[in-house]
Amino acid sequence: AVLDGQHRLKAYLELGLPLEDLVVIEPLNKGVAIALLIAEMNICTKTWKGSDYMAAPAMAIKETNAAFDFAMELQRRNFPLSTISFWACGNNKLKAKDLVASLKTREMPQCLQEADGWCAKSRKWFEAASEKFTAKFLAKKYLITFIQDGYNAADDASAYTSEMEEKLKNLTQWQADKIQNARKTSTQTQEQIILDLLREHL
């Protein structure tokens, strides 16, 4: 029902048809917009708890930017929202409730509006990393939070940005596989081992 409703809503928006003529279900609260109802269903229904949270906002938002487009690209690759937030915004501020709120305002969440500068850097890192790491590994927060911590601590952020891009490009496939295939041991968690390997090779 949720998917069917989204398809109908998208068709109405693309054809420029009046949304008041679209009937998905008979609402108990007629004051709730259909697009908002669909988004609420996506977020509150466990079946749709994965990557579908951005579909309805993407149809409703009037104007986007590079950060939003990057976030949508990652969403299509089934990245979780928390990881998308770090890649696209440089923080963990992008929340599902903000995307639902954007349906009412038809504006992007504030953290995406302010993220173009970060996104210009992180997209370069992502593209370089994608040549060596799998999407499954990049969908976890290990790499982007490691990069972000280094960026925040850098004396020269511009130099760090370029250096990290080069380091990612120069990473051998053997090194990348060693990092992304790391497993926990009796003395270290998987995260600790991955972070140690990232420090060693990047």
Identify the residue ranges that each predicted region occupies.
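Accessory terminal alpha-helical modules
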Residues: 1-202
